[in-house]
Amino acid sequence: EDNDLKNRLLNKYSGYLSSLWRELSRKKKKGKLPRDARQKLLHWWQLHYRWPYPSELEKAALAESTGLEAKQINNWFINQRKRHWKQA
């Protein structure tokens, strides 16, 4: 009975599952930020630890100097504050 159900489900959804698999395997893999970009962000972090909220201009400058996108800069600061910042 279990095998019958398994076979029916596979027959019904195998095309959908294989297309999902192809789509997932094509997606860009997420990875760590480049080392030099992380170092630049950490340097800014250390200089501004008491209030680590860069202005829009500072974020644009960081994006330019690191080669990262604005969204990556924003996410890095959100994660860094959440994980490592203890408000004074």
Curated annotation (Swiss-Prot):
GO terms for cellular component: nucleus. InterPro entries: ELK_dom (IPR005539), HD (IPR001356), Homeobox_CS (IPR017970), Homeodomain-like_sf (IPR009057), KN_HD (IPR008422), TALE_homeobox (IPR050224). Transmembrane segments: none annotated. Probably binds to the DNA sequence 5'-TGAC-3'. Its main location: nucleus. Belongs to the TALE/KNOX homeobox family. This is Homeobox protein knotted-1-like 10. Pfam families: ELK, Homeobox_KN. Keywords: DNA-binding, Homeobox, Nucleus. It is found in: Nucleus. Residues 25-88 bind DNA. Residues 4-24 form the ELK domain. One of its GO terms (molecular function) is DNA-binding transcription factor activity, RNA polymerase II-specific. It comes from Zea mays (Maize).
